[in-house]
């Protein structure tokens, strides 16, 4: 029960006694000298979760409270006691008392609607209007002059410095093999067409690094994958935000009609069937009807196919508008010279303009649908914010790329040279047949003698005779066999063994290892461990008479083939002695593979990043010795069905690792002098969201086992989720996280069993299955059927999870996913048509829909954070702008003078966002433990953790640490500097004297309690 704090207090030395006369209760609290902490009694709920202090509660939930029935409370206590989570000591946090920025409405819900609309306008109104207009007729001929040319509705043509419209569709074309900078751009507004031509293209400048000018007053740019077009606009390259905003039709399509990754293979097969059916319509081919039947069968089995398409403009225009785009002209822009472009210039401008027109037609169709699917203004507002991200760099960027590439080439050459030496040595055995046949590695190779090269007529020297395998690897220019660590020859030349058994290549199974048939005990043990034996029927080339062959295990499971035992995922097997070699260079090859894996996969994307330097444009920063540049990430604000942002370099960049070449990538993003990065990671974001969904059924935080473990679990006592899972499985706490998040996203028993066996190769299949079953019974629970009594009460006849720590959560998630039109509980965002149950067969893509419920809610969280920061930056004139977001992480670039105010703004944004989640799920309370970020980072580089030194094989010099500030530390900094958003002062506040329980029970409550009881104790 909660009671109000009395304003009259008696102070004595370091102790303060608060007398609550209403209940004759004496509170004895240690006095704090900090002005932002008071002596109010802690507000701890009936199951032991501390709520917001009275001062914060009254500001975030003004005159609001939440009551639960005694039956709900009793059930929650029984459930927690069953899982040994009741009556644990509460983690006690200070009673904070400071003035928050005022809510922009009577409730936190009103507040978010209003601040979402604040940033959305006037752009939202412009976009709505623009989606209803028709554009002028497209010009047939285009003037050949540099810069912008305006083609007005009345037929007049004029040279303009930039388009003067405040809303337009925009598209650019580049000679991508020559330069990332644009050569042609077209735009269309309600009143005019515009065309921009590069001065370099027309021979008016020697510099191909030409940026496109836009209106300094700002405009709304609509485009398909519009971030690509944004990268070519001059005004976007400045330390200060431009007044432009960008609306991406690709994101609008994905959010309304996008498909998940599991659906795409089916979509491509269906399209192939459709194309075949169309191509035979006019023919008299007997097969034409069967092709059409194929396509109709696809539609019958997968109705969602008629409601979705992949994301390219060509496919989206066809799907929404039945516009057939001819993209063959795109090949002309692959030219290495500008002359071919000039010869077809009018034709190519028309091609670009037709894409622009088609984008507007798509926009007219999809934008109204988007507003129905995502009706909250905060979603629209956040989407615009994501379109404004930017990354500052200096010349350390160039040094990084050059240095890593040089080291990468050196490491590759070191291993390749050794492999070449082994090949040279092995080829000399061509005349020693017995030696080759006795060698389990060399006998796999093709030893057919052949001439190394053709003999010239006048040549006197004999042509060397070599084995056929050597000839295939021979390079004439280098005059030696060139063999890389990725080659199939490498494991053979390195004499690799799996558990002391030679490796062999199978075209069917990939890399396998041979065990002599006489080793029956070992064969039985390998079968118990789940290793897959090879079948003679599948691959007849292996020697099954003397050996049993097993597939080399793969991290993706028994179905996957090992393509290279020298890839980074096999390094741990080498260190554990499972994978062996006679040669030291094998270890080097594996180390190189692990070290270079990041750079080899990302180098093309990293090296092709478009950097605009201070010599190219006025970037708003004083010149410095180390220079200054800006990268605009090519981000799709809503690139997945869960509305997550997508970008292929910065949103997928790994954190720096000591053995990973080039992994210091993010730390190459550096704030210029006078600026700093301020950011934070949301603590256990998705875990808290699903726990809240479970707790909301009781209207009490910590009512479910998962909720209690998330809010009050202690690592030291083993009561947090990861420690509990680690204890069940006998794995480390870090390993347990993989199992927990995998289960949350739909991983089943099969995947968990496989993961256990990967972590412990000695574990038998039966043992791993038993452990996995034990984990799922304890967490997700067991499948139960709805009893007749519950059905008579009006509950549907279905199965549900019961008795587990997470049963309440999974039942809630699955119930959400099975709704005809599921929506996120917070911002009311709907699922795409491709995953809507009305367009699916029964239970189809259930895992994807459950994932959608979780991840889409997490996207709502990010959007609310961004909208909150937009409001606070504007209201308090903070010198800050969004730099980058990565799912549960936000980073702002702030001036040094405002960095602590921005840090405080982030804490307020998090408090508001968590509170809004709670209110939307029916609880007008917020646990103190999650109200604020555990810390806000203030740093001069971009990195996951301010304490990371970012030392890697390519970066030997540690990067100095940044600051890591808790909410108390931030408040202390503001107090010391005399800065804050609102005056840093305590406020008088009261919390109503009300019990948390209510005797009122409705019939609906009885039904819900009966179902909750079944989930807990069935």
UniProtKB/Swiss-Prot annotation:
Source organism per UniProt: Schizosaccharomyces pombe (strain 972 / ATCC 24843) (Fission yeast)
SUPFAM superfamilies (alphabetical): DNA/RNA polymerases, Ribonuclease H-like
Other notes: In eukaryotes there are five DNA polymerases: alpha, beta, gamma, delta, and epsilon which are responsible for different reactions of DNA synthesis.
Location (main, coarse): mitochondrion
Keyword Nucleotide-binding belongs to the record: no
Pfam families: DNA_pol_A (PF00476), DNApol_Exo (PF18136)
Gene Ontology MF annotations: 3'-5' exonuclease activity; DNA binding; DNA-directed DNA polymerase activity
Cofactors that this protein relies on: Mg(2+)
Keyword annotations of the record: DNA replication, DNA-binding, DNA-directed DNA polymerase, Magnesium, Mitochondrion, Nucleotidyltransferase, Transferase
Protein name: DNA polymerase gamma
InterPro entries: DNA-dir_DNA_pol_A_mt, DNA-dir_DNA_pol_A_palm_dom, DNA/RNA_pol_sf, DNApol_Exo, POLG_palm_dom, RNaseH-like_sf
Presence of the UniProt keyword Lyase in the record: no
């Amino acid at each position: 029960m909660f009671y109000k704090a009395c304003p009259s207090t008696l102070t004595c030395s370091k102790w303060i006694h608060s007398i609550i006369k209403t209940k004759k209760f004496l509170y004895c609290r240690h006095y704090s000298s900090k002005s932002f902490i008071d002596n109010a009694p802690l507000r701890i709920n009936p199951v032991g979760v501390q709520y917001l202090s009275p001062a914060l509660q009254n500001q975030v939930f003004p005159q609001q409270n939440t009551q639960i029935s005694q039956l709900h409370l009793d059930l929650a206590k029984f459930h927690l006691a069953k899982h040994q989570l009741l009556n644990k000591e509460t983690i006690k946090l200070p009673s904070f008392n400071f003035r928050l920025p005022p809510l922009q409405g009577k409730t936190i819900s009103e507040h978010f609607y209003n601040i979402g609309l604040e940033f959305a306008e006037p752009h939202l109104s412009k976009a709505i209007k623009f989606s209803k207009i028709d554009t002028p007729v497209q010009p047939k001929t285009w003037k050949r002059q540099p810069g912008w040319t305006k083609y007005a509705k009345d037929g007049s043509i004029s040279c303009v410095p930039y388009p003067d419209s405040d809303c337009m569709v925009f598209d650019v074309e580049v000679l991508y093999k020559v330069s990332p900078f644009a050569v042609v751009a077209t735009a269309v507004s309600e009143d005019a067409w515009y065309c921009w031509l590069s001065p370099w293209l027309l021979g008016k400048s020697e510099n191909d690094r030409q940026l496109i000018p836009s209106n300094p007053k700002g405009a709304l740019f609509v485009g398909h994958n519009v971030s690509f077009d944004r990268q070519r606009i001059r005004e976007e390259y400045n330390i200060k935000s431009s007044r432009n905003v960008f609306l991406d039709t690709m994101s609008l399509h994905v959010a309304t009609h996008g498909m998940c990754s599991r659906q795409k293979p089916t979509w491509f097969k269906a399209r192939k069937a459709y194309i075949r059916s169309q191509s035979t319509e006019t023919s008299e081919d007997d097969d034409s009807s069967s092709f059409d039947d194929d396509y109709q069968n696809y539609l019958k089995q997968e109705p969602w196919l008629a409601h979705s398409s992949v994301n390219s403009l060509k496919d989206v225009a066809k799907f929404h508008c039945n516009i057939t785009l001819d993209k063959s002209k795109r090949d002309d822009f692959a030219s290495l010279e500008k002359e071919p472009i000039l010869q077809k210039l009018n034709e190519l401008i028309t091609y670009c303009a037709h894409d622009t027109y088609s984008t507007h037609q798509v926009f007219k169709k999809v934008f109204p649908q988007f507003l129905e699917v995502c009706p909250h203004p905060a979603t629209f507002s956040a989407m615009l914010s994501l379109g404004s991200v930017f990354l500052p760099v200096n010349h350390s960027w160039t040094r990084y790329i050059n240095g890593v590439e040089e080291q990468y080439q050196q490491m590759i050459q070191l291993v390749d040279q050794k492999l070449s030496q082994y090949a040279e040595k092995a080829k000399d055995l061509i005349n020693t047949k017995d030696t080759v046949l006795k060698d389990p590695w060399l006998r796999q190779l093709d030893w057919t003698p052949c001439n190394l090269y053709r003999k010239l007529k006048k040549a006197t020297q004999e042509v060397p005779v070599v084995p056929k395998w050597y000839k295939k690897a021979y390079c004439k220019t280098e005059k030696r066999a060139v063999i890389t660590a990725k080659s199939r020859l490498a494991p053979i030349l390195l004499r690799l063994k799996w558990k002391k058994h030679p490796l062999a290549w199978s075209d069917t199974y990939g890399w396998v290892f041979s065990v002599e048939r006489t080793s029956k005990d070992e064969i039985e043990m390998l079968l118990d461990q789940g290793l897959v034996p090879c079948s003679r029927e599948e691959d007849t080339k292996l020697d099954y008479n003397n050996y049993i062959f097993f597939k080399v295990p793969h991290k993706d499971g028994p179905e996957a083939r090992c393509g290279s035992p020298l890839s980074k995922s096999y390094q741990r097997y080498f260190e554990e002695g499972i994978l062996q070699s006679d040669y030291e260079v094998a270890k080097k090859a594996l180390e190189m593979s692990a070290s270079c894996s990041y750079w080899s996969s990302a180098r093309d994307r990293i090296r092709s990043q478009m950097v605009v330097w201070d010599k190219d444009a006025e970037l708003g920063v004083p010149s410095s010795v180390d220079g200054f540049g800006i990268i605009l990430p090519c981000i799709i604000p809503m690139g997945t069905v869960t509305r997550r942002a997508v970008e292929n370099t910065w949103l997928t960049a790994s954190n720096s690792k000591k053995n990973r070449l080039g992994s210091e990538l993010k730390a190459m993003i550096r704030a210029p002098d006078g600026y700093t990065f301020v950011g934070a990671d949301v603590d256990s974001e998705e875990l808290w969201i699903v726990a809240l969904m479970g707790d909301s059924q009781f209207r009490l935080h910590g009512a479910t086992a998962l909720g209690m473990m998330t809010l009050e679990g202690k690592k030291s006592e083993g009561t947090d989720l990861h420690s509990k899972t680690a204890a069940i499985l006998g794995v480390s706490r870090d390993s347990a996280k993989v199992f927990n998040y995998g289960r949350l996203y739909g991983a089943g028993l099969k995947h968990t069993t496989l993961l256990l066996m990967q972590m412990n190769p000695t574990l038998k299949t039966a043992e791993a299955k038993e452990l996995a079953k034990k984990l799922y019974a304890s967490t997700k629970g067991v499948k139960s059927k709805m009893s007749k009594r519950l059905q008579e009460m009006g509950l549907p006849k279905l199965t549900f999870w019961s008795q587990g720590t997470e049963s309440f959560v999974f039942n809630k998630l699955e119930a959400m996913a099975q709704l005809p039109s599921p929506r996120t509980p917070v911002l009311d965002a709907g699922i795409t048509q491709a995953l809507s149950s009305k367009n699916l067969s029964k239970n189809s893509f259930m895992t994807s829909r459950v994932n959608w419920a979780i991840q889409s809610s997490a996207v709502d969280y990010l959007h609310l954070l961004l909208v909150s920061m937009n409001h606070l930056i504007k209201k308090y004139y903070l010198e800050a702008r969004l730099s980058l977001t990565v799912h549960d992480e936000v980073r702002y670039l702030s001036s040094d003078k405002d960095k602590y105010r921005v840090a405080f703004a982030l804490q307020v944004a998090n408090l508001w966002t968590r509170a809004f989640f709670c209110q939307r799920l029916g609880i007008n309370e917020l646990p103190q433990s999650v109200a604020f970020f555990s810390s806000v980072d203030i740093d001069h580089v971009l990195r996951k953790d301010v304490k990371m030194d970012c030392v890697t094989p390519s970066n030997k010099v540690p990067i100095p640490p940044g600051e890591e500030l808790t909410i108390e530390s931030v408040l202390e900094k503001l107090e010391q500097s005399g800065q804050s958003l609102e005056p840093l002062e305590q406020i008088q506040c009261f919390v109503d004297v009300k019990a948390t329980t209510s005797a009122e029970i409705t019939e609906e409550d009885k039904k819900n309690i009966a179902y909750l009881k079944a989930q807990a104790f069935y």
